[in-house]
């Protein structure tokens, strides 16, 4: 920090890309996404912080517009019944499915083509990095903190205004109609993960530790 004449170095949490890829390629039968053009997934605790209501309301707009979309929500928490009630009340159970957290979430993530994060705030959301490892397009709330940094201010995915249902639905529509652009963004996002490489970051930790031995 320049104010205190202190040298600082940012080292991100190590990301084990090879393990995520191995787990993601585990074969299993899962037919929910069959026939859908947009295969969206959200993995988060069912709490107010994760703002599933914004996600569900945006998806409802798209369903009413006859957009071919399915959404898988994976998690657990106090808001589960609230989420289930919304799905039931709006009769969208054919398009939206809830499952509990899984021992291997990556094989479900691999089946999707779009990851959506709607949090009101985060730290550094590892789930975005995991989605990038498995080469999924990301749409995330521009919440404090983490998503903007990970997605390089929109270079490696789409950012929408937090709690803005219309903005989120429009970002999903953009994803639906821009396949070539999406593939380019996914490719660049995957390459950007060198910042979080497991071996590289572990070496950086060891270098710092050695200075104090």
What are these regions (language model features)?
Residues 38, 45-64, 78-84, 126:
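A conserved mid-protein helix/loop that constitutes part of the nucleotide-sugar donor-binding site
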């Amino acid at each position: 920090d320049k104010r205190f004449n202190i040298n600082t170095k940012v080292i991100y949490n190590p990301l084990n890309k090879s393990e995520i890829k191995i787990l993601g390629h585990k074969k299993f039968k899962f037919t929910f996404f069959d026939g859908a053009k947009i295969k969206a997934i959200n993995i988060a605790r069912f709490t107010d912080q994760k703002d599933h209501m914004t996600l569900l309301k945006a998806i409802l707009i798209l369903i009413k517009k006859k957009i071919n979309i399915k959404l898988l929500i994976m998690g657990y928490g106090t808001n589960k019944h609230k989420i289930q009630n919304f799905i039931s009340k709006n009769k969208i159970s054919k398009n939206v499915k809830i499952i509990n957290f899984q021992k291997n979430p990556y094989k479900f993530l691999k089946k999707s083509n779009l990851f959506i994060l709607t949090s009101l705030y985060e730290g550094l959301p590892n789930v975005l990095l995991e989605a990038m490892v498995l080469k999924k397009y990301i749409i995330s709330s521009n919440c404090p903190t983490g998503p903007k940094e990970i997605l390089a201010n929109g270079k490696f995915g789409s950012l929408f205004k937090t709690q803005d249902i219309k903005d989120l639905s429009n970002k999903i529509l953009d994803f639906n109609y821009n396949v070539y652009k999406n593939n380019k963004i996914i490719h660049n996002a995957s390459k950007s993960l060198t910042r979080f490489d497991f071996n590289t970051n572990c070496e950086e930790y060891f270098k710092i530790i050695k200075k104090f031995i």
